[in-house]
A protein has these predicted regions:
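Short hydrophobic segments within beta-strands
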Residues: 5-9, 66, 91, 156
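Gly/Ala-rich beta-loop-alpha elbow adjacent to hydrolase catalytic centers
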Residues: 67-75
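Active-site loop/turn elements of alpha/beta-hydrolase fold enzymes
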Residues: 34-40, 93, 186
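Catalytic nucleophile-loop/oxyanion-hole region of alpha/beta-hydrolase
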Residues: 35-58
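Short, surface-exposed alpha-helical segments at coil->helix boundaries
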Residues: 15-22, 48, 165-170
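The alpha/beta-hydrolase serine catalytic core
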Residues: 85-87, 91-209
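Aromatic pocket-lining residues of Rossmann-like dinucleotide-binding sites
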Residues: 25, 78-82
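Short, surface-exposed "cap/lid" segments of acyl-processing enzymes
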Residues: 1-39
């Protein structure tokens, strides 16, 4: 059984959460694969390009997916179409990303992005703004806001998340009995509750619960 961590938007395999789960799983003899979903080309990033990276990484083998923010949404999208995903841990999953992201920019900024084709976005891994193509919006329109996967999953979401509303995870969990939702005293990063998340997700990720 393979385990993959899918990082968030404008992040990288070197994120704090990725390294936390890599270390914890290593302590239990489980290697964690952390692909670079942008493949070094953030400007031309799309949901389809990231799903293709995930598909190559899993190589059709049974796997467990851990996804953070946009990585959580991508994990849900991928699992909905690929039964070789056996279970998921979604951390503040960015449901509705294709519709929410441009809307939250505001009408003027979103229209300027559509017109020029590029938007400067702060990239956390690089510590500076990087251009992002409008193709991520156009490509994203083909994907469901709430991917309908049936595999067992744990969702962890911060009650004080100002980036992805916890109400989205609540809405998803109500209609999906395969999902266990944990609402935590944290923000979008969840860094202050990682040990708590490990307590209820560790056995699940190992296939023991």
């Amino acid at each position: 059984m393979r385990h993959l961590y899918l990082h968030g938007f404008a992040s990288s395999p070197a994120s704090a959460k990725a390294r936390f789960f890599e270390q914890r799983l290593r302590e239990h003899g489980i290697p964690l694969e952390i692909p670079d979903l942008a493949q070094g080309d953030f400007e031309h990033l799309t949901l389809s390009s990231q799903l293709a990276v995930i598909d190559r990484a899993t190589a059709g083998q049974e796997c467990v997916l851990i996804g953070s923010s946009l990585g959580g949404y991508l994990a849900a999208l991928y699992a909905a179409q690929h039964p070789h995903v056996t279970r998921l841990l979604l951390l503040a999953p960015a449901f509705c990303f294709p519709s929410r992201f441009p809307a939250e920019l505001g009408k003027e900024t979103a229209e300027n992005w559509r017109r020029t084709g590029l938007l400067p976005v702060f990239h956390y891994a690089h510590g500076e703004p990087r251009n992002l193509s409008y193709a991520i919006v156009e490509d994203g329109r083909q994907y469901d806001d709430f991917p309908d996967f049936t595999q067992p999953a744990i969702l962890a979401h911060g009650l004080h998340d100002s980036v992805v509303p916890p109400s989205l995870s609540r809405e998803y969990s109500v209609s999906h009995p395969n999902v266990r939702l944990h609402l935590l005293d944290s923000d979008h990063q969840l860094t202050n509750v990682l040990d708590q998340i490990w307590q209820f997700s560790g056995p699940f990720l190992e296939g023991k619960a």
